[in-house]
Amino acid sequence: MEVWGPDTDRSDRLWVVLLPGLGGDPEHFHWLARGLSASGWPLALVDHPGSDSAAVQALLEGRQSFDGAEALRQRLADLRAVLEAQRGGQLPVPGNRVVLVGHSLGALTALLAAGAQPVAGADQRCEAALAGLPLTNLSKLLQCELAAGRVMETPVVNPLPTAVVGLNSFGGLIWPEKKSKPLGIPLLLIGGTLDLITPPLDEQLGLLAALGLHGASRAVVVEGASHFSPIRVDGQASEEEGDDLFQLGEELVGVNPLTVQQLIALELIRFLNQLEGDPAAGGMQHLSDGTTRWHRLDRSSAARLTEQLQ
């Protein structure tokens, strides 16, 4: 685990736990940790041995198998250990209000830890979802593996998070819209239009409609961004080739990943700043910086859009 101290002091007493996704390492998110700490928030960046890049590389090379349920169980235990260490003073991170930020499986971990209760009937939903190979939503395969592993019934962490931020989050089969009990804390769910692993219509917008009752909850969809856009690998900041599991082509990474990462940091910092004040204006907002377009939606606009397009 890495600890990032703030460049400046804030009065909101917020601190952040950042959880990489499956196959992710802390180094992939140094860009985000740097931006958050520069804005005044202390941060713990968690490493998850057993489901990090080394574990996935071993899986790809046939040296070990992968148990999704066990990986999630271990990630939840890692998160509880971090929170307990901070609360007990063993982790040198100031603050008494925690925000959980996770990418993909890290976001699922954060939602479960925050008290999102899986809806009964996942077996039947999975049977219907997997009747055909879900090529446009590969997360369904992992969702169904986790549902079969009976690992998602987990106690809420202490302290309860002040908010949850999900980058390329998933859970549409776990928390179906109109059947789920919403969370009472703010959610920010960020995705991209080129994400074929956790597509925003099924996953981020669906999750916001299902769980995002709080008035400050938002989804942000970035045009041209993919599932791997939040991951920065060695050499990506220049024209060099990095040596990394996620050294992927544009067709998988999406367009302008560095610009997308800047937008993610911008939206996340905006969200954290607004936790202290009134929720931002609702509805759907269409934004552009001249090179990239993105869309900000509240719960009602996300629900309308998913209903119209399904």
Region locations from a protein language model:
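Short beta-strand-to-loop junctions in surface cap/lid or active-site-entrance loops
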Residues: M1-D12
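Short substrate-entry loop that stabilizes the transition state in hydrolases
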Residues: R10-R13, L18, L22-A55, L173, ...
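Alpha/beta-hydrolase active-site loop
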Residues: Q64-P92, G121-N137, L142, R150
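Gly/Ala-rich beta-loop-alpha elbow adjacent to hydrolase catalytic centers
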Residues: G102-A110
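Short beta-strand/loop motif that positions the catalytic acidic residue
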Residues: L183, L189-G191
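Short alpha-helix in the alpha/beta-hydrolase fold that links the catalytic acid
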Residues: P199-A209, D234
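Catalytic histidine neighborhood in serine/cysteine hydrolases
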Residues: L211-V233
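Alpha/beta-hydrolase-fold serine-hydrolase catalytic core, especially in secreted/extracellular enzymes
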Residues: A225-H227, V233-Q310
